[in-house]
Amino acid sequence: MQIKDNIKPILPHLIAVLIFTVVSFAYFYPVLEGKVLKANDSTVSKINSREIQDFREKTGREPLWTNSIFSGMPAYLISTKYPGNLIKYADTFLRMYKMPVSVLFLSMAGFYILLLAFGVSPWLAITGAIAYSLSSFFFQILGAGHNTQAIALAYMAPMIGGIYYTYRHDALKGALFTSFILALEIQANHPQITYYAMICLLIFGIVEFVY
């Protein structure tokens, strides 16, 4: 009886995770057959990072600049490894499924957290999360190979939810959660989406201070 009482509060969330997993694999079922989504930008990215990888393998050092694009640009925008970056391990764990299954699952889970923070019931939040993640824009950018953009969008929703929870509910728990998600957002390495998220949060912060 005690075990049942302990499980009951988290049961809707466990069901949500199961539903999101099933929907993600059902939509991208060819992944289960060993197939890979071939996207133009993913191929171009491998080509652009070739010079960086060759230098890394030859010298054992991490290059900070590449001449392979335009007249040269910082390597961190293309391919840079950070051995001391512990948040990378968390990101790898959260994206344990193969692409693009992992990003679809994360976008559902992230928007689910956002809706929960806004006080939406778990069952309605599941529906909203699926509707959000199955919007055409996600599949357009995945088809084009904009993987980092899709990942940043997936982390954007729970980050906004964390800020809202910090203001309206528990400041300490909300701040800790938001800090963790913000680190994942930065780890996604898509400054454009992070910039848009900051604009949304700035507007929300101004409204909170005024009202």
Predicted regions and their residues:
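Start-transfer (signal-anchor) and selected internal transmembrane alpha helices
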Residues: M1-Y27
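Short secondary-structure boundary segments
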Residues: I3-K8, F70-T80, E185-Y195
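Polar/charged alpha-helical tracts
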Residues: D5-P9, Y29-P30, E57-K58, T178
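Hydrophobic alpha-helical segments and their boundary regions
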Residues: I7, H13, I19, S49, ...
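Membrane-interface starts of transmembrane alpha-helices
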Residues: L11-I15, A90-M99, V120-G128, G174
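Membrane-interface coil-to-helix junctions
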Residues: V23-L114, F118, I130-A157
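Membrane-embedded helix bundles of polyisoprenyl
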Residues: G110-A117, P122-V210
